[in-house]
UniProtKB/Swiss-Prot annotation:
It catalyses: (7R,8S)-7,8-diammoniononanoate + CO2 + ATP = (4R,5S)-dethiobiotin + ADP + phosphate + 3 H(+). Its main location: cytoplasm. CDD domains: DTBS. The lineage of its organism: Bacteria, Pseudomonadati, Chlamydiota, Chlamydiia, Chlamydiales. Keywords: ATP-binding, Biotin biosynthesis, Cytoplasm, Ligase, Magnesium, Metal-binding, Nucleotide-binding. Mg(2+) binds at residues 16, 43, 96. The gene is bioD. This is ATP-dependent dethiobiotin synthetase BioD. It is an enzyme of class 6 (ligase). It comes from Chlamydia pneumoniae. Belongs to the dethiobiotin synthetase family.
Length: 219
């Protein structure tokens, strides 16, 4: 049984899609500890719809799409670390964080510090935008300073030369490359999952560098 935390260099970089792919690939369950905003179409709903994975209830459901500590303040809720407990399961578990690694979680603690003591592996999601290389390097540095087990990185929308540069500079394996899809469907998720699953099952230590554009293989 593996517990894998999916974290991003920022918010909106593709963590939920990566979570859905891995949940499908590893036949894993899914848990979002804190859902901030979009309660009617939560990340748990999206992951379940795309992958069919069982999604555990969130520890906190907050109304505003803000960092957890701010959304909790607006809702007059106090986020307590003692209430953020990974669900008990014998299945693989994908855990998706809210926002970036160093986003404020409680009123006093950053998200990375809240989860760094957990017995989990980590996957970092990086999306290409102006400043993303800097954000990626800073996030990796922060994760390594906490001695986390980083399985690798998923890159989203990077040109090939920048993807290569990241690999050489950061020295993390590229687990997968997300292409710019017109629409994210169950078929797209399934296609990515099959590619990633093949590599994962061939290496008991985890995914080691699979990339590609599954949508090109649908025919």
């Amino acid at each position: 049984m593996q517990r894998i935390i999916i974290v991003g260099i920022d918010t909106g970089v593709g963590k939920t899609i990566v979570s859905a792919i891995l949940a499908r690939a590893l036949n894993a369950e899914y848990w979002k500890p804190i859902q901030a905003g979009n309660l009617e179409n939560s990340d748990s709903n999206i992951v379940h719809e795309l992958s069919g994975a069982y999604c555990h209830p969130e520890a906190y459901r907050l109304h505003k799409p803000l960092s957890p500590h701010k959304a909790a303040q607006i809702d007059n809720v106090s986020i307590e670390e003692s209430h953020i407990c990974a669900p008990k399961t014998t299945s693989n578990l994908i855990i998706e964080t809210s926002g970036g690694f160093l986003s404020p979680c409680t009123s006093k603690r950053l998200q990375g510090d809240v989860f760094s003591s957990w017995s989990c592996s980590w996957i970092l999601v990086s999306q290409a935008y102006l400043g993303s290389i800097n954000h990626t390097c800073l996030t990796v540095e922060a994760m390594r300073s906490r001695n986390l087990n980083i399985l690798g990185m998923v890159v989203n929308g990077y040109p090939e030369d920048e993807e290569h540069w990241l690999t050489q500079e950061i020295k993390l394996p590229i687990i997968g490359t997300l292409a710019k899809e017109k629409e994210i469907t169950k078929t797209i998720i399934s296609c990515y999952a099959e590619q990633w699953k093949e590599v994962w099952t061939s290496n008991h230590q985890g995914i080691q560098g699979v990339s590609g554009t599954p949508s090109l293989n649908l025919h």
